[in-house]
Amino acid sequence: MSAGKYLLGTAALVGGVYYYDQYVQPILPRQQHQELAYQTQRVENKGSELNNKLTKKIEEGKKFVNEKTESVTKQVKNSDVYQKLQLNTEDYKKHVEDAVDNDKNVFVVGIQKYIDFVNQLGEVKVQTGTTQYSTVSPNVEVKEKSIFGNWFDKSDNKVDQLKNDADKKINEAKDKAESTKSDFFNWNSKKADELDKKANEAINWTNKQIDYASAEWHKHYEQAKGDWNKALDDLSKQWNDSKKQLNGRFDTEKDRAIKGVEDAKSNFEKLSNDLANDASKNQKLKDAQDHFGKSLENLKLFGDDVYNDFAKRFDDLFNRK
């Protein structure tokens, strides 16, 4: 077939397609470009919306964990257990300091009393009706009023008895002082043991309260972390479902566009053969060919592989000799 005949046939075919499309049955795609652009924009908007939701959900999750952590910390500090722990710790410190000071004071006062008591024993004087005896010196000085000489022997016996009584009192006083000192140190030792026991009890109680507070905080933290992970899982599932929905919509629109082009191609070939000898239809066929070219350009929205495949087919159709 010569080039002139081919052009004539092509023009007739295009004119026939146009006539058939306008007056018999619509076969050419309409508003394809606008529809594909609209669907593409919807896909982009949907992706942007999901991305914004994901970012917002992550920020809300971070804020939720921070608020939960601050709330748990505040609850622990405001709890009766924590307040009693602080109060008992301060009271215990003050009690120990006061006890140490009191023990020091008691010890010092006791020693001073003991020293004063011993000093008082340094000199003991016994006054009788006629004689004053001193225990300072072992040589007892006797000053008698001389009345009757036969009283001297009796006075010597009294001196010895008084001296013995004084020595006995001194020894008893010393024994009592030693006993008092021993009792004091024993008491002080018991007091120290009692303070150590109270200190250990306070430390054990404090450790228990700290362990309890730590366990409570850990429990609330784990709960907040679990809620956060669940929120992320739910968001990820929602994103995957939306992505599948968008992909399915995209594939559907692509298949619809491909089918429309294939149907138009089939109708164009059929009309080209039917109108090959009708010269008045050449311009209409040319217009139909241009329209096919535009619809073919729309296939670029679905990838170069789809476009190249159909472009080759139409090149073969419009360039056949």
Swiss-Prot record:
Its main location: secreted. The lineage of its organism: Eukaryota, Fungi, Dikarya, Ascomycota, Saccharomycotina. It comes from the Eukaryota. This is 37 kDa cell surface protein. Keywords: Cell wall, Secreted. GO terms for cellular component: extracellular region. It is found in: Secreted, Cell wall.
